[in-house]
Every structure is written in structure tokens, then in C-alpha cells.
């Protein structure tokens, strides 16, 4: 009996010594599924926000890093208090915690305002934050975060935005791109995506009449050169 008891104690001790399972890194790639390059008419339908119970699951997976008490969302040094969005100019903001990236220690909160929305990147250790106009996607190391837009959301975000997180600071760079879609990180230095072919605009920059087929988009890349992000010109 003693040997069996000791074996049981050893097993319990071994299980207790195992580290807690880390929460999976936030992955918002499916938020781009309803964009113009896929023939989508309402990009908002593809956003994974406002789903009942979703935030509670994300907070539970944070293993104590993030907490909510009523209208107050706490992420380390950062406290966000919801003010219901009732109308234009009321200053209302609603916050929903989505998850984070263990690789960089950054957290992501969705922000809803009157006729506006954003994704806020937060460093809960320093309290610093920055907002992006589209669903953020982290590079393999988690130190570069990209978002692209095709002017299909209420914030009218159109183009590419890349945020570098270095030495505890956020550095943002905006890149002109027409109806950007389908971002995929190939490495920490290369972001693949699709942009609208220039032949679908006239000399004045206006869109040609008619619907845009999925074939109107061209696959290209954004690459980092000498510390700057540059869009490789797409083929016509």
C-alpha cells in the first residue's frame, strides 16, 4: 500500500510540476475571407467580434494576464472602460479583448466607435499602445504586425499598415496599395498579399464600370529593405 501511495504522490507531483499550457496565439486570417477580392459585399460579416462568450474564452486563455470587471477591461498597466456608443460625437468606445501573441507579449483589443472601428495593440508591461485599421496579423517572430484594407469597412481603411515593435516601442508605416487583400507572412521580412490591378482604373484613378472579378487582383509582396517596408509593384 505504501508503495502504491508514494507512486500516486509522485504522479500528482509530476503533473503539478508541468507548466500550464500556453494559450494559442491570436490568428485573425479568417477575418479577411469576405473581402472584395473574394467577391464579398460585406467585409464586416467576416470579423470575429461581438460573438457571445468569445471574449470570456479569450480572457480565460490569457491565464490571468487579462481581466474584466463589468465595463472595465484590465491588461497589466492598462485599464479600458467601456462607454456605450450611442451616437455621433458622444465619445463612446466599446472594447473587446481578442487575444495576444506570446512571442512578443502584445495583446489585441477590438475598439468600436460611432461609424468607426480599430484594433488596438497593447503592451501590458509598459502601457504603450497603437491602433490599426484592420485585423492585425503577426509575423513569425511576432515583432512585425500587418493589417490591410480594401475600403470595405466603416472606417474606410484602404492600403497597408505595418507596425514594428522594437525596444518596447511601436513604429508604424503606412503603404499605399489599392484594395489590399489576403495578407500572409512568408517571413519576418516578407508579407505576401493581393492588390487590385492598375488596369481596372481609368486615367483619373476612377474605377472602371462593372463588378470587379476575383481575377482583378494580383499577388505581390511587401518587403523590408534597409529598415523600410516597400511594396513590389504588381503586374498589370
Task: For each feature predicted by the language model, list its residue ranges.
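Bacterial N-terminal signal peptides that target proteins for export
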Residues: 1-8
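N-terminal signal peptide c-region/cleavage motif recognized by signal peptidases
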Residues: 12-19
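Terminal domain-start segments
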Residues: 21-112
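Blade-terminus and WD-like Trp-Asp/Gly-His loop motifs, strongest in beta-propeller folds
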Residues: 58, 67, 98-105, 135-147, ...
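Surface-exposed loop/turn elements that mediate protein-protein interactions on large endomembrane-trafficking
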Residues: 69-88, 114-131, 158-173, 205-233
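Beta-strand C-termini and the immediately following turn/loop, strongest in propeller blades
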Residues: 109-114, 147-154, 158-159, 193-199
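Mid-length scaffold segments of soluble, non-membrane domains
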Residues: 119-157
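Conserved blade-ending motifs and adjacent loop-strand segments that build the rim/top face
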Residues: 174-182
